[in-house]
Amino acid sequence: EVNGVRWNLFNLHLKSKWTERKDDPNANLRREKEARTIRDYLRKRFLPADGHPYLIAGDFNDHKNSAPLRRFLQVNDIALTEMVQCVDSNGHFWTHYYAKQDSYSRLDYLLASPSFFKRMVPESAFIADRHFSLWASDHRMIYADFEF
């Protein structure tokens, strides 16, 4: 609770795309099932019509148009969350560096309920990109400011 506003933060880490096996078709299925299970829990706990503010943050291990991400954005015509567009100081969107394949991807997201999204401070959503950003992890930190 902040300044009398009760809200919830959910942090998640969905199944990785990369496994020890070269071809792991179950990884995609598991990630989608994880997303659906979490989404269903949120829908039961927070009805969209109630307007309860919440934020989902974490490593979704998938691209922004993937089935797991879509599970969190809407059901039929009902918006569940809105994607917070984080960007680094160079205008880049990548949050993960995979050294083995020398590839950059956006796997980490902030998803805000419609009522929480309205509290976001304009132009406050960033991806940390200082020279030491990847020392602690292969993911870069994402963050945004919200007003209460």
Name every feature range the model reports, one short phrase each.
Residues 44-55, 61-148:
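Metal-dependent phosphoester-hydrolase catalytic domains
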Residues 33-44, 70:
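Solvent-exposed, polar/charged alpha-helical surfaces in well-ordered, non-transmembrane soluble domains
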Residues 14, 59-60:
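Active-site metal-binding loops of divalent metal-dependent hydrolases
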Residues 3, 31, 55:
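A surface/extracellular/periplasmic glyco- and lipid-processing/surface-interacting theme
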Residues 10-12, 29-35:
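Loop-centered beta-sheet repeat module
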Residues 9, 55-56:
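Beta-strand elements within well-structured catalytic alpha/beta cores of enzymes
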Residues 1-18:
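Beta-strand-turn-beta hairpins that frame and shape the catalytic cleft
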Residues 17-30:
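Acidic/histidine-rich helix-loop elements
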